[in-house]
Amino acid sequence: MVQASMRSPNMETFKQQKVEDFYDIGEELGSGQFAIVKKCREKSTGLEYAAKFIKKRQSRASRRGVCREEIEREVSILRQVLHPNIITLHDVYENRTDVVLILELVSGGELFDFLAQKESLSEEEATSFIKQILDGVNYLHTKKIAHFDLKPENIMLLDKNIPIPHIKLIDFGLAHEIEDGVEFKNIFGTPEFVAPEIVNYEPLGLEADMWSIGVITYILLSGASPFLGDTKQETLANITAVSYDFDEEFFSQTSELAKDFIRKLLVKETRKRLTIQEALRHPWITPVDTQQAMVRRESVVNLENFKKQYVRRRWKLSFSIVSLCNHLTRSLMKKVHLRTSEDLRNCESDTEENIARRKALHPRRRSSTS
């Protein structure tokens, strides 16, 4: 008989049983500051999953581990979603020190790793991947769930050994349900991909995800990052000023349709930014005539620069994301007088997930994070 933890009705219940009694725990897939991800096999079915062991914060005064409330929010959101382009939560266990999420195993690695191995890529092929991302986000936004951490590392492939791999959005640690009439502000995410309203500590909504999709698309087509500066301050300033361009060196073979799609996403005013429905209807994603379809087919992605910049980007991100996120927290904390420990937790959580993927988020059938 399964015993659930006794908690108030509005709190998530996790099984208070040893996960090892139901799953054979295998090799480590990744690790981070507050989580370890291991491959596992369900004893009753033989099916493989990924077990994410999240270290619980033991007291409010501590900054080690993840607070129960944040874990519950992530689990609550994952239990609400069921979509082909979103990772699936199978089960949740809890012991004295950890909460263990049993997640879908995604073995195809990151989308950008897959693209970096290709010899050529047309915009038509690129939009097939962007469309899958949009489909997953559309499902979330229909439920008024904002992901708040869309970035290349959180876009995985179910299986890379097929012509058009199936995309899975992962890592719902920062996801949040947007409630009508309830103002939500926070400092979180990976600075390179966060919207101006996050940097400025303004009310947040679904629009922040659309900005991130614009940044992801820009990088996918060129290898260059629109706002990443030489310093932390420059990156944040570029975001708030929406300071970017389509350098001819990187975008000489990019269609005007693709540039228009990006321009309409990288808009500072949230009301003027494309919604998810508008993005899906954009002619670069859904051509309205044969001419537009031909433009996509004949325009190509700058894979040479993509590969060159991607290797550099991966190294730079792994080296600098901790200091960049901490800078974002410190500077904005002074502005709004936030509690230091809680803001740093958000940044540390994001850093954890980046580190966790270094080892083997790529060779598996699911992602290390939800």
Curated annotation (Swiss-Prot):
Region (Autoinhibitory domain): 292-301
Region named Calmodulin-binding: 287-354
Alphabetical UniProt keywords: Apoptosis, ATP-binding, Calmodulin-binding, Cytoplasm, Cytoplasmic vesicle, Kinase, Nucleotide-binding, Phosphoprotein, Serine/threonine-protein kinase, Transferase
InterPro entries found in the cross-reference section: Kinase-like_dom_sf, Prot_kinase_dom, Protein_kinase_ATP_BS, Ser/Thr_kinase_AS
Localization per Swiss-Prot or TrEMBL: Cytoplasm; Cytoplasmic vesicle, Autophagosome lumen
Subunit structure: Homodimer in its autoinhibited state. Active as monomer. Interacts with 14-3-3 proteins YWHAB, YWHAE, YWHAG, YWHAH, YWHAQ, YWHAZ and SFN; the interaction requires DAPK2 phosphorylation at Thr-369 and suppresses DAPK2 kinase activity and DAPK2-induced apoptosis.
Residue span, Protein kinase domain: 23-285
Leading EC class: transferase
PTM: Autophosphorylation at Ser-318 inhibits its catalytic activity. Dephosphorylated at Ser-318 in response to activated Fas and TNF-alpha receptors.
PROSITE patterns: PROTEIN_KINASE_ATP (PS00107), PROTEIN_KINASE_DOM (PS50011), PROTEIN_KINASE_ST (PS00108)
Residue numbers bearing the Phosphothreonine modification: T369
Species name: Mus musculus (Mouse)
Family annotation (PANTHER family): DEATH-ASSOCIATED PROTEIN KINASE 2, SERINE/THREONINE-PROTEIN KINASE 17
Pfam families: Pkinase
Gene designation: Dapk2
Keyword Phosphoprotein (UniProt): yes
Database matches in SMART domains: S_TKc
GO molecular function: ATP binding; calmodulin binding; identical protein binding; protein serine kinase activity; protein serine/threonine kinase activity
Name of protein: Death-associated protein kinase 2
Regulation: Activated by Ca(2+)/calmodulin. Regulated by a double locking mechanism, involving autophosphorylation at Ser-318, calmodulin binding, and dimerization. In the inactive state, Ser-318 is phosphorylated, and the kinase is dimeric. Activation involves: dephosphorylation at Ser-318, release-of-autoinhibition mechanism where calmodulin binding induces a conformational change that relieves the steric block of the active site by the autoinhibitory domain, and generation of the monomeric active form of the kinase.
Positions bound to ATP: L29, G30, S31, G32, Q33, F34, A35, I36, V37, K52
GO cellular component terms listed in the entry, alphabetical order: autophagosome lumen; cytoplasm; cytoplasmic vesicle; Golgi apparatus
Tissues in which the protein is found: Expressed in peritubular interstitial cells of the renal cortex. Isoform 1 is found in the adult brain while isoform 2 is expressed in brains of embryos and young mice (at protein level).
Residues annotated as catalytic: D149
Catalytic activity of the protein: L-seryl-[protein] + ATP = O-phospho-L-seryl-[protein] + ADP + H(+); L-threonyl-[protein] + ATP = O-phospho-L-threonyl-[protein] + ADP + H(+)
Names of required cofactors: Mg(2+)
Modified residues (Phosphoserine): S299, S318, S349
EC number(s) on file: 2.7.11.1
